[in-house]
Swiss-Prot record:
Molecular function as annotated in GO: toxin activity
Protein name, entry field: Orpotrin
Residues making up the signal peptide according to the UniProt record: none
Keywords, comma-separated and alphabetical: Secreted, Toxin, Vasoactive, Vasoconstrictor
Stated role: Vasoconstrictor.
GO biological process, one term: vasoconstriction
Tissue-specific expression: Expressed by the venom gland.
Misc note: May be produced from creatine kinase by limited proteolysis.
Keyword Secreted appears in the UniProt entry: yes
GO cellular component: extracellular region
Subcellular location: Secreted
Length: 9
């Protein structure tokens, strides 16, 4: 979701 991890879109 774009919080701390770019992969955790």
């Amino acid at each position: 979701h774009g919080g701390y991890k770019p992969t955790d879109k």
